[in-house]
Amino acid sequence: MYISALLNVESTILDFWHLLKPRIMYLVVFTAIAGMVAAPGSIHPFLALISLMCIALGSGSAGAINMWYDRDIDLVMERTKNRPIPSGRVFAESALEFGITIGILSVFIMAIAVNYISAALLAVSILFYVFVYTIWLKRRTPQNIVIGGAAGAFPPMIGWAVVTDSVSWESFILFLIIFMWTPPHFWALSLNRSEDYVKASIPMFNVIHGPKKTRKHILIYSILLVLTSLLPALFLKKSLFYLSMAIIEGCVFIWFAISVIRLKNHSSQKKMFSYSISYLFSLFASIIFCSIDLF
């Protein structure tokens, strides 16, 4: 009986953990670290840890509220039907309360322990994801991912503000990289999930404009992304190394985008989606390495 109770507690904790969309959270925290490391100045390690905790909680808050609001469409989509709310493992009201609570806590702690600018940016990113993307754009326009992608682009900007207590053109460049990355990344996935989006009545770009136009736009945004990714060389310490990495990784990204147009199949789109994740991690890892004099 005691073991059974422990297993139930563990299962509940895991369900609430999944509400936070942990895979997105890892990327959010990693890009925030890049913003902190690339920023001029320094911060006490304990404050840096507190900041990253707040950013992670803020990201999780947006994810939990998103799952609460999207519980109806999650239920009919193959990709999302096993999430905690549609599967019945977590009550919708509990998910909403959980999301709001950790969101408020994350912003409050950031404001008290770090600075008001980073707290304000964190609040804006949460509110943008919930109200602008989830509630307003997602079910209304095929540009949902393009505009809504701004929510996921804030973390390096927040990380920069944690250290500098300011927003600058350098941090905006880091924001812009993720903003340009989001459409080709997500459209590569949505091309393979068109039936899901049709069932859920979500006007994804590929559903409204068709796969041919979507693939062309994947290439367009990929080129814009690669061009944008070169800009951090203007302020990084090891700019030549970074530039080399950005060019090599960017050429591979464009090659995958061209493959999506040329092959027009599930496999090329899946590979594009998978590589786009590796690409962003690698690019921001290069930003970190080129900011701390490791070589």
Swiss-Prot record:
Domain of life: Bacteria
GO molecular function: protoheme IX farnesyltransferase activity
Gene Ontology terms: biological process: heme O biosynthetic process
Catalytic activity field: heme b + (2E,6E)-farnesyl diphosphate + H2O = Fe(II)-heme o + diphosphate
Pfam families linked to this entry: UbiA
Keywords: Cell membrane, Heme biosynthesis, Membrane, Transferase, Transmembrane, Transmembrane helix
Keyword Secreted appears in the UniProt entry: no
Subcellular location: Cell membrane
InterPro entries documented for this protein: Protohaem_IX_farnesylTrfase, UbiA_prenyltransferase, UbiA_prenylTrfase_CS, UbiA_sf
TM regions (residue ranges): 27-47, 48-68, 94-114, 117-137, 144-164, 171-191, 216-236, 241-261, 272-292
GO CC, alphabetical: plasma membrane
Uppermost EC category: transferase
Membrane topology: Multi-pass membrane protein
Function: Converts heme B (protoheme IX) to heme O by substitution of the vinyl group on carbon 2 of heme B porphyrin ring with a hydroxyethyl farnesyl side group.
NCBIfam families: cyoE_ctaB (TIGR01473), PRK04375.1-2 (NF003349)
Name of the protein described by the UniProt record: Protoheme IX farnesyltransferase
Gene expressing this chain: ctaB
